[in-house]
C-alpha cells in the first residue's frame, strides 16, 4: 500500500495528504452535483447525509487508533483528532474552548466557496 511513499520527503508527504483531502472533497462534490442534476437537491442531500453518516465513524475509528486515544478521551481527544479529519485537511479551521465546550469551526470552506463561485 505504501509503494512510492518511501521516496517522498516529509514536505511532499504533507502536500500529498493535503492534495488527497482536497481530492476526496472534490469527489464528494462531484457525485453530489451529479445526483442533484438527476434527482434534485432533496435527494442529493439525503444521500449525502447517509454517506457521511457511514463515513465519519470509520474515519473516527482510524484517527482514534492512529492517535492511540482511549475510549473515553473526552473533548481533549476530540480536539486532537478533529484537525486530522479529511475535511479539516482540505479547509481552514479553528478550535476554540468556550467555558467547558469545544467549538470547531470551519473558517474557509472549499465546498461553500465553490458553490458561491458557481452561483
Residue map of PLM features:
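N-terminal accessory segment detector
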Residues: 1-103, 108-119
